[in-house]
């Protein structure tokens, strides 16, 4: 239950997170670089108020870049990076891309793997033997090599990553589907 709640929260933040503030994914302001996290409402409690402890040769020093640069109306919920880009927006934009790749690869993997495994298990005999030998060869090629070669040959991007995952990750699903088909095909309710 906790895992499902966490996944739902991540999906909701990936969808709505970048729109929760005024910053864009690629927008940058070099005058606001390396700001610590600052969240409206929590700053009154001394939590996420934009201050940070810095170690110096004489000890530690508490600084607040928002006050030093007179940016009291600026809020970076996760802080800003060395180019002055909002980390909150960039985090959830990245999560959005990762979720799209994961869902697409899982769906394609399930369709190819289940189809291959069910066909192999259903027909059995020579068809099953040939399909399983091909599966063993495909499983013997290291996945990292295939992914790296595809990224070198094709233009790097989301489609290439989905294609690489699709080519390499269907083997496990195929074996599971084949085993289930072989188990079910000999059951009495099927033979009747």
Q: Predicted regions span which residues?
A:
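Alpha-helical transmembrane segments of integral membrane proteins
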Residues: 2, 80-192
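Gly/Trp-centered helix-boundary motif
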Residues: 1-110, 114, 118
């Amino acid at each position: 239950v906790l895992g499902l709640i966490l996944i739902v929260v991540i999906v909701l933040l990936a969808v709505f997170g970048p729109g929760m503030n005024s910053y864009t994914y690629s927008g940058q302001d070099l005058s606001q670089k390396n700001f610590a996290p600052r969240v409206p409402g929590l700053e009154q409690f001394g939590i996420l108020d934009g201050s940070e402890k810095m170690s110096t040769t004489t000890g530690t020093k508490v600084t607040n870049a928002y006050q030093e640069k007179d940016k009291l109306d600026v809020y970076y919920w996760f802080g800003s990076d060395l180019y002055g880009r909002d980390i909150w927006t960039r985090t959830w934009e990245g999560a959005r891309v990762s979720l799209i790749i994961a869902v697409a690869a899982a769906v394609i993997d399930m369709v190819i793997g289940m189809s291959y495994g069910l066909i192999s298990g259903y027909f059995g005999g020579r068809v099953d033997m040939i399909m399983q030998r091909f599966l063993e060869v495909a499983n013997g090629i290291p996945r990292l090599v295939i992914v790296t070669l595809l990224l070198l040959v094709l233009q790097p991007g989301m489609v290439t990553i989905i294609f690489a995952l699709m080519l390499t990750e269907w083997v496990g699903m195929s074996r599971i589907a084949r085993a289930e088909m072989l188990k079910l095909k000999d059951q009495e309710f099927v033979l009747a």
